[in-house]
A protein has these predicted regions:
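Alpha/beta catalytic cores of group-transfer enzymes, especially the acyltransferase/condensing modules
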Residues: 126-161
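ATP-binding N-lobe of GHMP and related small-molecule kinases
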Residues: 1-102, 106, 114-124, 156-158
């Protein structure tokens, strides 16, 4: 079992300049820090005795045979992106509710990617972890968010991006 603890963040200056549509034309800079509130992901391979191959637990519980059947968009896209089809059980717990404005969805995505890369015994740099999370949420899921959330979640602490 792998357990990740990924921080939530507070943006102090420059929020909005991290949107691709802005920084590609004008540049951008963001000052943010992570706080002592976290997203926890517990992930483990699911033994083959169960009728389902994937169990995802968050505010809901999902059971399915294939990742494409998941309703949770970030979890579905992470499993698809990493091409994981082994039996898998994932539990999410957070110190704060979703939509808190503190980058919770990005912390979830970074934490899940980190857990699954670790389970696969694949090292990934913090930069690449943040970039994968950006690709998933901004490009594939087309969420209207900037990049600071993913970088803050991956690197933690006080940062200028």
């Amino acid at each position: 079992m792998i357990i990740t603890r990924t921080p939530f963040r507070i943006s102090m200056f420059g929020g909005g300049t991290d949107y691709p549509g802005w920084y590609r034309e004008h540049g951008g800079a963001v000052l943010s820090t992570t706080i002592d509130k976290y997203c926890y992901i517990n992930a483990r391979y699911l033994p083959p005795f169960f009728e389902h191959r994937i169990r995802l637990v968050y505010s809901l519980i999902e059971f399915c045979q294939h990742s494409s059947e998941l309703d949770h968009p970030s979890a579905r896209e992470v499993l698809k992106f990493l091409d994981i089809e082994n039996g898998l059980e994932i539990h999410y717990d957070g110190d704060l509710p979703g939509r808190s404005g503190l980058g919770s969805s990005s912390s979830f995505t970074v934490g899940l990617l980190n857990a699954l890369h670790t389970m696969s015994r694949k090292y990934i740099s913090l930069h690449d972890l943040a970039e994968e999370a950006c690709k998933l949420e901004i490009e594939l899921l087309q969420k209207p968010i900037g990049k600071q959330d993913h970088y803050a979640a991956a690197y933690g602490n006080l940062n200028v991006f």
